[in-house]
């Protein structure tokens, strides 16, 4: 399961979810302004900016089309 920790009115967050939607990548969206436990999780991972994307053992912050493309490629059937 891919999780996108996000905030409203965050340009990089919108770009991230838009790119994932365009590629048909399923994800769970968590609003950091409404979930203090999620905010603690993001901080524990070492991030101070949104979005934070967690995909299995991999995670990153910011809009990363290169990482999103790798997720898309990993989901393609062999």
Say what each PLM segment does.
Residues 11-12, 36-37, 66:
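Short alpha-helical
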Residues 25-38, 47-49:
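Thiol-based oxidoreductase modules, predominantly thioredoxin-like and allied folds used
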Residues 50-61:
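A short, hydrophobic beta-strand/beta-hairpin element that forms part of a small beta-sheet core
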Residues 67-78:
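C-terminal basic regulatory modules in eukaryotic proteins
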Residues 1-25:
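Local sequence-structure signature of Cys/Sec-based thiol-disulfide redox active-site neighborhoods
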Residues 7, 47, 65:
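ATP/adenylate-binding site constellation spanning eukaryotic-like Ser/Thr protein kinases
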């Amino acid at each position: 399961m891919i999780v996108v920790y996000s905030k409203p009115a965050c340009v990089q967050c919108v770009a991230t979810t838009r790119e994932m939607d365009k590629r048909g990548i399923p994800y769970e969206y968590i609003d950091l302004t409404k979930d203090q436990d999620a905010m603690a999780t993001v901080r524990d991972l070492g991030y101070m900016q949104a979005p934070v994307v967690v995909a299995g053992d991999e995670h990153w912050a910011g809009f990363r089309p290169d990482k999103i493309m790798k997720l898309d490629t990993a989901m393609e059937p062999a």
